[in-house]
A protein has these predicted regions:
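Single conserved hydrophobic/aromatic residue that forms the stacking wall/gate
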Residues: 1-6, 10
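Acidic, contiguous internal or C-terminal segments within carbohydrate-active enzymes
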Residues: 21-24, 32-72, 117, 121
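Alpha-helical support elements that line or immediately flank enzyme active sites
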Residues: 54-55, 225-228, 261-274, 334-345
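Structural helix-adjacent loops and short alpha-helical linkers that scaffold large soluble proteins
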Residues: 162-166, 188, 206-215, 226, ...
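Active-site-proximal, well-structured secondary-structure segments within enzyme catalytic domains
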Residues: 169-212, 216, 233, 238-245, ...
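Solvent-exposed loop and edge beta-strand segments that line ligand/cofactor-binding
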Residues: 204-215, 248-258, 320-331
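Carboxylate/His-rich catalytic cores and anion/metal-binding grooves
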Residues: 219, 226, 257-306
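Active-site-adjacent "gating/activation" loops or surface patches in catalytic cores
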Residues: 291-335
Length: 345
């Protein structure tokens, strides 16, 4: 999603600019002043509503203006009608996708033209983004499920009509029910270090590893990453993470059945985020039939009397459509079984 409200920050004179990710409530926040007006922006991914939410506010009534469009880097049909932007298409592998941007303002006007929506003279603006594909994690159904439009019809409009405060409250309540389970205390950081921005503290830590508060923050940041990228009913955390910046990420953002997946889930049980482990457990169960077929087709795995093996194992790299590549990782199946045991034990 392209928003001129975000990009114009780099073109105008601004002061008191701050941006932060609040690990306590899982909300990204931006604040700055320009021409005597204070602008605030908040964004979060809502599990209860299954949407991304962005809220823009201006301290002076009628001061928020922005154009919204979709910068889609794959072939897609993009259109705007009323307060809704829609984009849809089919990827080269046959997977269908659709996304909707639904815009609601307080004050001002909303108009659509071509593939763009313009907001003028508003006090505030809430943007709800909903996206779906027809992917289904089921080998027997060839990984294809319900049409994305039918999925979106069930919840997108309802989420967009919900008051921003209610969306935010529901998100925070669900997020904190998991995040607040664990607190750590590694000591106290010196005041002159604690007041520095995180990038400077990370740099200073390399020279003098004495910043207990930073260590606590990084521990909780790791929990935040898993909490935000692996929930029941979703795909598990992948190589680059769900929220990486790429359309075409390195290694196709697949799964490497080795320490890459293992590191992502180190904190699932010890850090009291057991629900996050469920996505990996479901993924292993869904991939097992395809892995069994591939394992039995490999004659090198045959038993001494020449029969295919009864079990299965994995190759090092794997994608969500059951594809396996690179070298066989023969003990990989046992390692996945250990994850399942740890989850239920």
């Amino acid at each position: 999603l392209y928003s001129s409200a975000a990009s114009d920050v780099y073109k105008r004179q601004v002061e008191d600019f701050t941006r932060a990710l609040d690990l306590r409530d899982g909300i990204y926040k931006v604040n700055y002043k320009s021409d005597g007006v204070t602008y605030d922006r908040e964004a979060f991914a809502s599990t209860p509503a299954n949407v991304l939410v962005i809220n823009y506010r201006a301290s002076k009534p009628g001061s928020f203006n922005a154009d919204f469009s979709v910068n889609c880097q794959v072939d897609a049909d993009i259109s705007a009608k009323g307060p809704i932007l829609t984009w849809k298409g089919t990827l080269k592998n046959g997977m269908n996708f659709e996304g909707r941007v639904l815009i609601r303002t307080k004050g001002g006007t909303v108009s659509a033209s071509g593939d763009r929506i313009s907001v003028k003279d508003a006090d505030s603006c809430t943007v709800v983004i909903a996206m779906e594909t027809d992917y289904l994690m089921d080998y027997k159904k060839d990984w294809k499920g319900e049409a994305p439009s039918r999925k979106l019809d069930r919840y997108a409009a309802k989420s967009a009509s919900t008051d921003y405060a209610a969306l935010k409250q529901a998100h925070i309540a669900q997020y904190k029910s998991m995040f607040d389970r664990v607190k750590v205390d590694f000591g106290k950081t010196e005041p002159e270090v604690a007041k520095l921005p995180i990038p400077e503290r990370l740099k200073a830590y390399k020279n003098k590893p004495s910043d207990p508060d930073l260590e606590e923050t990084m521990f909780q940041f790791g929990r935040y990453l898993l909490l935000s990228s692996s929930r029941p009913g979703t795909l598990p955390a992948n190589l680059q993470g769900l929220w990486n910046e790429y359309v075409k990420p390195p290694w196709a953002c697949d799964y490497h059945n080795n320490i890459n997946v293992q590191m992502a889930y180190w904190g699932a049980e010890p850090a009291n985020l057991s629900e996050c482990h469920q996505a990996l457990v479901d993924y292993v169960e869904a991939m097992a039939p395809g892995c069994r077929d591939a394992s039995q087709a490999n004659k090198k795995f045959n038993t001494k009397d020449g029969k295919p093996v009864r079990g299965w194992t994995v190759r090092t790299s794997q994608n969500i459509f059951g594809g396996n590549g690179w070298a066989w990782n023969i003990p990989g199946n046992a390692w996945y079984a250990l994850h399942i045991w740890e989850h239920y034990a």
